[in-house]
C-alpha cells in the first residue's frame, strides 16, 4: 500500500491553521455525543520510528475531556502475557462504552517486528493476520469505531530526524535500536508494512496513511479523518457488513436423542479406570505446561447431571 500511496497536496499554513481550529472544535463537541451514544473509540497510531506518533496523540487528546480517554504505550510483554494469546494484552486495553483509547503502536508493530526479525514462520504470520482480521471485525461488529493511522515519512526524512535527536543529549534517548534498524533496512520495512496493511485493510476498519513530514499538517490530517469517522459512527452505529465465515474445524457430535443413557460400569472397574486416566491426565498436564499450551474446558448440561462432580475428578488430576 505504501508504494502505491500518493500524498495529498499540503495546503498553505494559513489554511492549515483555520482547518485545525475547526477540526479541534468539532472533536470537542463530538466527544459528548460519543459519551451519550455509548460508542467506544479505538485509535491505533502506527508508523515509522520518529514519525511523531506520540506527538500527534498528544495534540489530539488536548481536545478531549481527560475522563473520556486513555493513552496506552505497549512495552515488553510480561511473563503472564507471553503465556496468553498474542492479542490478549491489547484486548485488556480496549475502551469501554463512550470512551477513547489511543494505542501508541499496537499489534501491527508487534507482528511486523516479529516477522522482520525472523520470529514468525510464514504459517504463523498468516495465522496472526487472520487473528487480527477477526479481532478487529469482532470489535466493529460490537459497535466499536476502530481508526487505524499509519504515519509515513521518507527514508531521508527519518534519517534526518534520527540525526537531530542523536545530536542533543536531552533527546538521544528517544532514538531506539529499532529506529536505527528500520532506517538501515528501510525498503524491507516498507514492504513489510505495506503487506501487513494490505492484508488487514477492511471496509469496517480501513487504514489511513498520513503524510507525516510536517507536524501541523500531520495533526490536521489525523484530526479531520478522526472526526469524519466519528461523524459516520454517530449517524450509523450498526454498519451493514457481512459476517466472516467460521473456518475452524468442528468435531462431529451426536444429537442428544442419540446419546445412550443406559450404560453402566462396575464400581471396582470404575475406580481402576479413573485412577489410570487421572494419572494419564496429570502427565499430559505437565507436557502442556512445558509447551505453554493453554486449555479451556467448558461444561454444559442438565441441572443435577453431575457437572460439578466431574470437574472435581478432572481437577484432582491437575496441579
Model-derived features: where do they sit?
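Glycine-rich phosphate-binding loop of ATP-dependent small-molecule kinases
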Residues: 1-319
Amino acid at each position: 500500500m505504501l508504494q502505491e500511496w500518493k500524498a495529498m497536496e499540503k495546503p498553505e499554513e494559513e489554511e492549515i491553521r483555520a482547518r485545525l481550529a475547526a477540526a479541534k472544535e468539532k472533536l470537542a463537541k463530538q466527544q459528548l455525543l460519543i459519551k451519550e451514544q455509548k460508542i467506544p473509540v479505538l485509535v491505533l497510531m502506527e508508523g515509522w520510528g520518529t514519525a511523531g506518533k506520540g506527538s500527534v496523540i498528544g495534540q489530539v487528546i488536548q481536545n478531549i475531556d481527560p475522563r473520556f480517554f486513555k493513552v496506552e504505550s505497549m512495552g515488553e510483554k510480561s511473563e503472564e502475557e507471553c503465556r496468553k494469546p498474542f492479542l490478549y494484552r491489547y484486548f485488556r486495553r480496549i475502551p469501554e462504552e463512550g470512551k477513547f483509547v489511543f494505542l501508541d503502536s499496537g499489534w501491527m508493530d508487534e507482528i511486523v517486528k516479529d516477522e522482520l526479525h525472523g520470529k514468525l514462520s510464514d504459517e504463523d504470520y498468516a495465522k496472526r493476520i487472520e487473528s487480527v482480521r477477526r479481532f478487529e471485525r469482532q470489535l466493529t461488529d460490537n459497535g466499536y469505531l476502530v481508526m487505524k493511522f499509519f504515519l509515513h515519512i521518507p527514508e531521508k526524512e527519518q534519517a534526518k530526524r534520527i540525526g537531530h535527536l542523536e545530536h542533543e543529549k536531552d533527546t538521544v534517548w528517544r532514538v531506539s535500536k529499532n529506529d536505527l534498524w528500520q532506517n538501515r533496512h528501510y525498503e524491507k520495512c516498507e514492504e513489510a508494512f505495506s503487506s501487513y496493511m494490505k492484508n488487514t485493510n477492511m471496509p469496517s476498519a480501513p487504514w489511513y496513511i498520513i503524510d507525516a513530514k510536517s507536524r501541523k499538517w500531520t495533526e490536521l490530517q489525523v484530526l479531520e479523518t478522526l472526526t469524519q469517522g466519528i461523524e459516520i459512527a454517530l449517524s450509523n452505529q450498526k454498519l451493514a457488513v457481512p459476517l466472516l465465515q467460521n473456518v475452524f474445524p468442528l468435531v462431529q457430535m451426536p444429537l442428544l436423542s442419540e446419546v445412550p443413557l443406559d450404560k453402566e460400569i462396575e464400581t471396582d472397574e470404575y475406580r481402576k479406570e479413573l485412577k489410570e486416566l487421572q494419572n494419564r491426565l496429570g502427565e499430559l498436564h505437565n507436557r502442556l505446561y512445558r509447551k505453554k499450551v493453554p486449555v479451556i474446558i467448558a461444561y454444559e448440561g442438565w441441572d443435577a447431571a453431575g457437572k460439578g462432580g466431574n470437574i472435581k475428578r478432572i481437577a484432582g488430576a491437575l496441579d
